[in-house]
Amino acid sequence: MYAASLVKELKNKEMIYITAIETYPNNAEPYCNAGAVAIEKGNHKHAKHLLNQAIEIDDLLSEAYNNLGIIAIIENDYESAASLFKQAKELGLNTNYNEGVVNIYKGNYDKAIKLMTKDNPNCDYNVALAQTLDKKYTIAEETVKCLEENGKTLYLQAVIAARTKDIEKSLKHLAKAIKKDNKIKNIAKNDMEFANMHDMPEFVALIE
């Protein structure tokens, strides 16, 4: 799939993999790669179909189980995700990071951090999230600072500031997050992380 590795546009990648499937219908890899593209496009039902086809052809294809595990996380089915990552790992794939993500949702924050940072740099959103949930606020703040500034990372910074009672900083980050992504208004409105700010005129002005 060298040609697809040179292509950045998802639609074009998808066409390359579809052509490969038509040309080599008994090769599992194009099905798996097309499934990965479908995940990126948000078409999870189609992705599962393609990945299961890949496994029917080659039930030792670790990436197919790994990608099905990613879909399971998206669908909030963490037990299935853990099982699929275990299968992928037994077939030789490094699944530390994805297992770490599962452990965030299971509430095993320290384990999640250790798994996600074992083979990856600390500069990662999910690492910062796990550190925040594990109440390691100083470390979490340093981690999130190295990330690209967008609505999601600014919102996490607002949460960290709210948890450490720095209301001014929380409002500042929240305002910047909303400016980046207006949908954050509705999220913040109902988020108990900001419960102690709900009656503040500055907060109300941000979420109106």
Descriptions of predicted regions:
Residues 23, 57, 88-91, 118-119, ...:
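Structural marker of alpha-solenoid helical repeat scaffolds
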Residues 2, 33, 67, 98, ...:
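Canonical tetratricopeptide repeat
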Residues 1-7, 29, 122:
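Amphipathic alpha-helical repeat scaffolds of TPR domains
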Residues 7-19, 40-53, 74-87, 91-92, ...:
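Structural signature of tandem alpha-helical TPR/SEL1-like repeats
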Residues 150-180:
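Sterile Alpha Motif
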Residues 183-208:
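Terminal, low-structured helical/coil segments at or just beyond the last alpha-helical repeat
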